């Protein structure tokens, strides 16, 4: 997540569009959470 925030900060500086980057982060976090769910399921945590 820290890496994602670093990338986002660079993107905001490049694009100057805060809103687009917030949307990108939201999408990234959703995918990340889905990945965690899959990992937990495969490891038997759920």
UniProtKB/Swiss-Prot annotation:
This protein's name: Major urinary protein
Family: Belongs to the calycin superfamily. Lipocalin family.
Alphabetic keyword roster: Glycoprotein, Pheromone-binding, Secreted, Transport
GO MF term set: pheromone binding
Source organism: Rattus rattus (Black rat)
Subcellular location field: Secreted
Expression (tissue specificity): Found in many tissues including liver, urine, preputial gland, clitoral gland, submandibular gland and salivary gland.
Domain of life: Eukaryota
Glycosylated residue positions: 15
Signal sequence coordinates: none
């Amino acid at each position: 997540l820290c890496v994602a925030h670093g990338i986002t900060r660079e993107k905001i500086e490049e694009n100057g569009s805060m809103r687009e980057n917030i949307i990108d982060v939201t999408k990234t976090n959703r995918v990340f959470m889905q990945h965690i769910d899959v990992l937990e399921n495969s490891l038997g945590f759920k």
